């Protein structure tokens, strides 16, 4: 695997921007790390100097959600680890978190090793991995424990959609969340009501709707919002931190915001697409263009969605930005030319993310430069526990840096992007703010518009469990949440008998008291108790009335059942 030799760099005159402060200072980089920050630095002679006067020095962007190797119908995405990370660096992103998705019959551990092998040989920037859980069975528990203990993974994703492929039941999700909490990891959810989506898909196909518009029509906003609410409910019951991937609609974003205000430990991830474009393109007369927008949950056709999501991102109700970058060529998308359910899902956004967020949030006056750093790198590094190695400009942090020109403008176009696909879903969008220099592992990889990347130079960044940013609140709540039963005397009043429905195949009805309650005969012999753990009694063979009248003296007998 190629290993790049780090440059020794002096960055002069820039404005250093972190999530909590901005200040003017020079910065010296050596051995891939930030070694000095300040004025009048004493540095070796003959080193490369970068003039950053009038520019900002930011932590390199962290894209929390990519799918550069996601298999769909046997096809792999057009932008693999090499091309995808090259595009990331071109846009100012210096680290990605990719999703491992195991094929049928492949274990989580084996899939993780496949992803590591592909990324280690091809990634141009540092990376880490989330692991998706498409199927839940007993051995999954041991696999999650091994991934956390030995492989540096601290985040797992479950699906509430894709029925009959990887959709989990609510009970399974509760079980998985409880395990993830005990392991100190972060539970991620793809939130859509898969049952409703499947029924809507059938209905639309029966009506003869086969084009990309069928995709958005079969995934209405409500099925995303409902699933987010359900995921929040389950996570709250399990006291597990929750991370909602791909927040695409106002309804879903509002659910996250409301839960956050109720004190639920929940994080929401809007993506480049939901912040920078809208779903009106699903009705384009150009099938290939419309198909390029197909992803789940879909990009919302409501043109006010992006403005709403950027407002929630600016207020802190949503905390991070990803891209969900997973691109397919027009020929690959055309597998679903006669059936929208077969169009491979995936869109671009890895290269455009930083500029789109700056344009929509900072240039529009919704957030300042510090909040921009928080939502593009720092919060992600804190949630997934690689802060301050990444996401901060500080002595000792990795030298993953972006020299940012807030005044530069560019128009996004498929003609000039660094992707292997014919369409760009942000075609024609003009962005203020773009990187002029990008530094990865202390080495200049973008300068004067020239990309100088090294496939395989990216390192895997292992992550520890129990990130403070996420788990301090969870731990405190665990201590406060111990449940104790109410001490009571023994209930010795009457118990109504009920007829339980017959078990399949038995042909007879079973008579029993309500489960867990003790049934007593009219006269109780304390020395010959008929109580058994099964709920049956010693005199069950004697025919009795199904109810009996209890005679009691005026005012009631003094026992546990009296109201006094």
UniProtKB/Swiss-Prot annotation:
GO terms for cellular component: cytosol. SUPFAM superfamilies: Composite domain of metallo-dependent hydrolases, Metallo-dependent hydrolases. Belongs to the metallo-dependent hydrolases superfamily. Hydantoinase/dihydropyrimidinase family. The gene is Dpysl4. The keyword Cytoplasm applies. Transmembrane segments: none annotated. The keyword Cytoplasm applies. Homotetramer, and heterotetramer with CRMP1, DPYSL2, DPYSL3 or DPYSL5. Interacts with PLEXA1. Interacts with FLNA. The lineage of its organism: Eukaryota, Metazoa, Chordata, Craniata, Vertebrata. The modification Phosphoserine is found at residues 529, 536. It is found in: Cytoplasm. InterPro entries: Amidohydro-rel, Hydantoinase/dihydroPyrase, Metal-dep_hydrolase_composite, Metal_Hydrolase, Metallo-dep_Hydrolases_sf. Keywords: Cytoplasm, Phosphoprotein. This is Dihydropyrimidinase-related protein 4. One of its GO terms (molecular function) is hydrolase activity, acting on carbon-nitrogen (but not peptide) bonds, in cyclic amides. NCBIfam families: D-hydantoinase (TIGR02033). PANTHER family: DIHYDROPYRIMIDINASE-RELATED PROTEIN 4, HYDRANTOINASE/DIHYDROPYRIMIDINASE FAMILY MEMBER. It comes from Rattus norvegicus (Rat). GO terms for biological process: neuron development. Necessary for signaling by class 3 semaphorins and subsequent remodeling of the cytoskeleton. Plays a role in axon guidance, neuronal growth cone collapse and cell migration.
């Amino acid at each position: 695997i190629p290993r790049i030799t780090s440059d020794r760099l002096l960055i002069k005159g820039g404005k250093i921007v972190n999530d909590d402060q901005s200040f003017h200072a020079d910065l010296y980089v050596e051995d891939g790390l930030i070694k000095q920050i300040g004025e009048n630095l004493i540095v070796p002679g003959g080193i490369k100097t970068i003039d950053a006067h009038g520019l900002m020095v930011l932590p390199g962007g962290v894209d929390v959600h990519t799918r550069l190797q996601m298999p769909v119908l046997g096809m792999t995405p057009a932008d693999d680890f090499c091309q995808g990370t090259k595009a990331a660096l071109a846009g100012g992103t210096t680290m990605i978190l990719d999703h491992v998705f195991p094929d049928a019959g492949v274990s989580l551990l084996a899939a993780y090793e496949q992803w590591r092998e592909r990324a280690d040989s091809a990634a141009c920037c540092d990376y880490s991995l989330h692991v998706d859980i498409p199927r839940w069975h007993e051995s999954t528990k041991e696999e999650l424990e091994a991934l956390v203990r030995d492989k540096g993974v601290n985040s797992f994703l479950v699906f509430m959609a894709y029925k009959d492929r990887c959709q989990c039941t609510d009970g399974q999700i509760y079980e998985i969340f409880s395990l993830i909490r005990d392991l100190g990891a972060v539970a991620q959810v793809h939130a859509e009501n898969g049952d409703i989506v499947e029924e809507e898909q059938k209905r639309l196909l029966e009506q003869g709707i086969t084009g990309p518009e069928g995709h958005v029509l079969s995934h209405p906003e409500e099925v995303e919002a409902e699933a987010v609410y359900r995921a929040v409910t389950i996570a709250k019951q399990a006291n597990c931190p929750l991370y909602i991937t791909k927040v695409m609609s106002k309804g879903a974003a509002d659910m996250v915001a409301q839960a956050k205000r109720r004190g639920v430990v929940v994080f929401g991830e809007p993506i480049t697409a939901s912040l920078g474009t809208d779903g009106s393109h699903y009705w384009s007369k150009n099938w290939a263009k419309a198909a390029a927008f197909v992803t789940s949950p879909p990009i919302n056709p409501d043109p006010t969605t992006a403005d709403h999501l950027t407002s929630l991102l600016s207020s802190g109700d949503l905390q991070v930005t990803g891209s969900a970058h997973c691109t397919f060529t027009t020929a690959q998308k055309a597998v679903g030319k006669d059936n929208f359910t077969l169009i491979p899902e995936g869109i671009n956004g890895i290269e455009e993310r930083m500029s789109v967020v700056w344009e929509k949030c900072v240039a529009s006056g919704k957030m300042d430069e510090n909040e921009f750093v928080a939502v593009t790198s720092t919060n992600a590094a804190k949630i997934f526990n690689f802060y301050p190695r990444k996401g901060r400009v500080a002595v000792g942090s990795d030298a993953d840096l972006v020299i940012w020109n807030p005044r530069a403008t560019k128009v996004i176009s498929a003609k000039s992007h660094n992707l292997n696909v014919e369409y760009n879903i942000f075609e024609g969008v003009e962005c203020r703010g773009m990187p002029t220099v990008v530094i990865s592992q202390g080495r200049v990889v973008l300068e004067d518009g020239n990309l100088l990347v090294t496939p395989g130079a990216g390192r895997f960044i292992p992550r520890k469990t129990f990130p403070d940013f996420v788990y301090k609140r969870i731990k405190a709540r665990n201590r406060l949440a111990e449940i104790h039963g109410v001490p009571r005397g023994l209930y010795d009043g009457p118990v109504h008998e009920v007829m339980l429905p017959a078990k399949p195949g038995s042909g007879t009805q079973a008579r029993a008291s309500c489960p867990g309650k003790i049934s007593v005969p009219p006269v109780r012999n304390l020395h010959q108790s008929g109580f058994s753990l099964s709920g049956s009694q010693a005199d069950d063979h004697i025919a009795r009335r199904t109810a009996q009248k209890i005679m009691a003296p005026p005012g009631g007998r003094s026992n546990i059942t009296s109201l006094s």
